Amino acid sequence: VKRPMNAFMVWSQIERRKIMEQSPDMHNAEISKRLGKRWKLLKGSDKIPFIREAERLRLKHMADYPDYKYRP
């Protein structure tokens, strides 16, 4: 069972698709670096919808898998 996505992962999933549409030849490592920089530059208020969605996913995950324990 996978862990629920955090706010960055929720946001980056959307943004990664946009970058890949614009620059299909860009390497995944470069996309990841750009996403990290852009996330850090986002204002807290712009992150709120993604934080809320991540919390919703976390609560759903807890309900779906009540005995789940993260084991790396």
Swiss-Prot record:
Pfam families: HMG_box. Residues 1-69 bind DNA. Gene3D superfamilies: High mobility group box domain (1.10.30.10). GO terms for biological process: brain development; camera-type eye morphogenesis; negative regulation of transcription by RNA polymerase II; neuron differentiation. It comes from the Eukaryota. GO terms for molecular function: DNA-binding transcription activator activity, RNA polymerase II-specific; RNA polymerase II cis-regulatory region sequence-specific DNA binding. It is found in: Nucleus. GO terms for cellular component: nucleus. Keywords: DNA-binding, Nucleus. The keyword DNA-binding applies. SUPFAM superfamilies: HMG-box (SSF47095). SMART domains: HMG. The keyword DNA-binding applies. Transmembrane segments: none annotated. InterPro entries: HMG_box_dom, HMG_box_dom_sf, SRY-related_HMG-box_TF-like. PANTHER family: SOX TRANSCRIPTION FACTOR, TRANSCRIPTION FACTOR SOX-4. This is SRY-related protein AES1. It comes from Alligator mississippiensis. The lineage of its organism: Eukaryota, Metazoa, Chordata, Craniata, Vertebrata.
